[in-house]
Amino acid sequence: MNGVILGSVVPMVRHRSGPVVLAIAAMVFGVTTHLHAQYMSTRHVRDVVRDSTVTPAGRLPATQAMSLNIVLPLRDPAGLKLFLEDVYNPTSSSYRHFLTVPEFTERFGPTQADYDAVVHFAKANGFTVTGGSRDGMDVQIKGPVSAVEAAFHVSMMTYQHPTENRIFYGPDREPTTSLSFPLWHISGMDNYSIPHPMLVRKSDYAKAHGISPEAVVKHATTGSGPSASFLGSDMRAAYYGGTALTGAGQNLGLFEFLGTDLADLNTYYKNVKQTNTVPITLLSVDGTSTSCVDSRAGGRCDDTEQTLDMTQALGMAPGLSSLVMYIGSTDTAIISAMTTHKPLPTTIGCSWGWTPVDPNTLDPYFQKMAAQGQNFFAASGDDSTWSKRNEAWPADDDYVVSVGGTDLTTSSAAGPWASETAWTDSGGGISPDKIAIPSWQKLSGVINSSNKGSTTYRNGPDVSANANFTFYTCADQTACLANEYGGTSFAAPMWAAFIALVNQQLATEGESTIGFINPTIYSENVTSSYGTHFHDITSGKSGSYSAVTGYDLVTGWGSPKAALINTLAP
């Protein structure tokens, strides 16, 4: 198997705002600093606040409770970079010798003394420690706004959102602490960006574009679900087509900001006359309710995203050992749990998008996943070409496998792949967060004049799968719908489950998991064997980009063929 050294996947220059930069910013903006104060390694003040696009509308009540997640920094980031270079280098004796959770902590996680210092700091400042772990590099805390302001030397202000009809809150300056070392990040200090699922309802899409629903797309004609819609099992038939591999022995995780009602999943299986045998766990990582009831949905159940994530993952890998939905209120709390939970999820799907105040926030965790042999698949979005307005993150992070969308046709119900074009709203393009181009996208033949990619910044997506309005869904404790929902939300869990098949085959051969797949698939796909393990999508467009031969910024390398399993697990 060919490969490429991960090397510059850890970019030398990113938009990092370390303590020195933040201290300078504090002086420029006239912020009072505290003697010997430690700034964070990441930003916490939104650009619209920093540049005075918005002005304070008020201040959070001093007694209002806040739940935060303190993230400690990596102990040896340079050493981790070198380790990742080795572990993804096929010529190295360390190739795919991944670390266990305790091994990672001992080499690269916070020391016990530093972790204890943060816990002591939190308690001494009036917070209750509610969760987190040294292995997870985080301390979950809860306390009143007054404690937040005093401990981190900020004022928690409210502002009119510049693009949404609501008030948001956030700190007026970069937080500091009295600790002897800088923290990495504190999640939960603002609610400027509310995470949203990467799915689209056809009727809403039609209304937004001033057209009839039937003008959006024709109904699926070759699915085995109601009204010929596609089921998760149809995607397995199209992209895998075999029976030997089911994901047996593998643990898959789903990244979720809301809970679900498993009755919706049971209704789906009852209606399509199938049975699910995979044990499902709804895991609250920080006390967030696992219920599907959402205040943003008027107190109603809202679990379309969560249910479709399960049906696509279970459809592709029906024999998984476990499927765990990691449910939380902050991104760091969710992903921290995903890097420490037993059994460890070695392949993960994320169908949510949001705009972090600092795109480097999750880097320590994504790097940790790569070191532990985990894969993180993120939906690339449903708003066409990436921009600052349509929230590409986390799909444009360089340690994430970005999954775009296609329009799939099969030869028959539950039949094999027949044809595929680019989905017209597939997210992709050049990183709006200006994340540096990783080493595997620098390979000769990846970026060219046909695909119009960047030679400076990260390009996406990496891969793709069906995302058109051709699926069958059951959700929200109400009804089941055929050919109504689409989005890259469907494609990300499909890919996560497909890699569970790869990991199963590797396990039968006594091998470790495949780990982060991008270095391998890029190096493989610039060779003549590309067409044997990927469906190269060469027609259709989305926004500024078109599907072309080879890699493109609409569908990436395309959708998987069964032969890809043998390429990754020879």
Feature map (PLM): residue ranges:
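Polar, glycine-rich mid-to-C-terminal structural blocks
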Residues: 402-436
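Sec/Tat signal peptide C-region and signal peptidase I cleavage site
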Residues: 31-37
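An often Trp-containing, charged/polar helix-loop segment at the C-terminal end
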Residues: 450-451, 502-553, 561
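Substrate-binding/charge-relay-adjacent region of secreted/lumenal peptidase catalytic domains
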Residues: 38-134, 140, 145-405, 431-487, ...
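Bacterial N-terminal signal peptides
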Residues: 21-30
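Walker A/P-loop NTP-binding active-site region of P-loop NTPases
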Residues: 498
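N-terminal secretory signal peptides that target proteins for export/translocation
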Residues: 1-17
